[in-house]
Amino acid sequence: MARVTVEECLEHVENRFELVLVAAKRAHQLSSGDYKPLLDAGKDKPTVVALREIEAGLIDASILSETYEMQEQLSAQQK
């Protein structure tokens, strides 16, 4: 597991507060099982996977603007 730094994650979000919101939402998506990791999760917990995805530029603040309906549609498609 590579170390995830806040500074590297901040290249993809505006500030630390937004980073917390984005990481929390993504970690919740991963832990619910409705979404699959975009990177190899290995034995990492959802929070670490979320931060690694942000650091890699795969997830950004646009995740915060998703509506409930969009989430429901994605969940239905993945099942």
From Swiss-Prot:
Pfam families: RNA_pol_Rpb6. GO terms for molecular function: DNA binding; DNA-directed RNA polymerase activity. One of its GO terms (biological process) is DNA-templated transcription. Keywords: DNA-directed RNA polymerase, Nucleotidyltransferase, Transcription, Transferase. Its EC number is 2.7.7.6. It comes from the Bacteria. Promotes RNA polymerase assembly. Latches the N- and C-terminal regions of the beta' subunit thereby facilitating its interaction with the beta and alpha subunits. This is DNA-directed RNA polymerase subunit omega. It comes from Ruthia magnifica subsp. Calyptogena magnifica. The gene is rpoZ.
